[in-house]
């Protein structure tokens, strides 16, 4: 219900936070303040993590304070909470489509097969490009996808939750994005057109960084990754030496905020205008996307709760071959590569 005050309680009773549903009746909770408070807009989340915590996996209840009714139990999944294997039996066809992940969110995907006249019939070696840019844009393949396709690979471009035509709330480099990547790898690998039912990942910068988070979840069907031009710590990229990076990082986050709004990318709005009902439905919760540029500015001191988003803390879990390159462009102000 629009304007409803929804109180989140942990399984053992304490009230954690109350959120006010937006004009569409949507609400989203990913963080918990140090003390219970009412959050009436997504802009207020920016100040929560500076003193609060990430909402931990577990069982919760939601109480509608206007009616007293309780909804739940609501289970918050962890990356390790794997779905029933039947989820990975989805059939993916050439062209634009959607792939469902473990919490029911659908991600927009673009499947491109190689030229059969040059490379023969399926199955083909297959790679995934996964980011919040436009990897599932049917009319503009990303560089990694384009090159791989020309070299004889089947390519699957996947937009992260909350971006492009995908559903869900955008939360940069969150555990949910890593878990989604696991589900994407396992679903794609089971397609009959995938050689040896193994896939790799490609991409530079954003889709390069995302590979490291996904590989750290150890999807059994992942063969190798090729992360190019990556960073090691998003917070230190935004606060190098304790000084706010008002250059590239500020602009990059501001662009992510703009592009993840409803119809924020021209191509996703074009699909909606052309009658893509799934794309339109997936935009409904975009009002819950946070302002990440403001969010990052609010965290002017490093918090241990940010460790889950530090590439440096997850890469030791990767157990597949890695081809990694680094970069030192002028737009970056901190060491970018992982030692």
Question: Where do the protein language model's features map onto the residues?
Answer:
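Short, aromatic- and glycine-rich surface loops/edge beta-strands on solvent-exposed regions
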Residues: 8, 39-68
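Accessory cap/linker subdomain of secreted extracellular hydrolases
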Residues: 142, 213-317
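Gly/Ser-rich "nucleophile elbow"/oxyanion-hole loop immediately N-terminal to the catalytic nucleophile
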Residues: 115-123, 169-177, 183-205
């Amino acid at each position: 219900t629009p304007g409803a005050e929804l109180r989140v309680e942990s399984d053992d009773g304490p009230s954690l936070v109350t959120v006010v549903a937006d004009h569409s009746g949507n609400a989203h909770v990913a963080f918990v303040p140090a003390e219970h408070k009412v959050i009436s807009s997504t802009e207020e989340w920016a100040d929560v993590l500076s003193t609060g915590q990430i909402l931990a996996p577990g069982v919760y209840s939601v109480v509608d304070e206007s009616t007293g009714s309780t909804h739940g139990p609501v289970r918050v999944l962890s990356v390790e909470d794997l779905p029933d294997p039947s989820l990975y039996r989805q059939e993916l066809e050439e062209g634009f489509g959607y792939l469902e992940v473990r919490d029911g969110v659908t991600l927009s995907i673009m499947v491109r097969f190689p030229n059969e006249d040059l490379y023969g019939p399926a199955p083909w070696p297959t790679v995934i490009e996964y980011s919040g840019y436009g990897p599932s844009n049917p009319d503009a393949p990303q560089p990694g996808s384009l090159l791989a396709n020309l070299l004889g690979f089947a390519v699957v471009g996947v937009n992260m939750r909350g971006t492009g035509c995908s559903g869900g709330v955008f939360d940069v480099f969150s555990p949910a994005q890593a878990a989604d990547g696991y589900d994407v790898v396992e679903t794609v690998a089971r397609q009959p057109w995938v050689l040896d039912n193994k896939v790799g990942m490609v991409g530079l910068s954003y889709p390069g960084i995302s590979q490291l988070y996904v590989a750290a979840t150890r999807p059994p069907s992942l063969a190798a990754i090729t992360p190019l031009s990556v960073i090691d710590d998003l917070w230190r990229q935004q606060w190098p030496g304790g000084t706010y990076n008002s250059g590239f990082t500020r602009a990059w986050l501001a662009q992510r905020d703009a592009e993840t709004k409803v119809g924020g990318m021209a191509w996703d709005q074009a699909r909606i205008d052309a009658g893509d009902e799934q794309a339109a439905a997936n935009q409904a919760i975009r009002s819950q996307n946070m302002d990440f540029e403001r969010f990052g500015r609010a965290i002017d001191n490093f918090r241990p709760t940010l460790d889950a988003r530090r590439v440096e803390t997850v890469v030791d879990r990767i157990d597949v071959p890695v081809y990694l390159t680094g970069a030192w462009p002028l737009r970056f102000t901190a060491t970018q590569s992982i030692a």
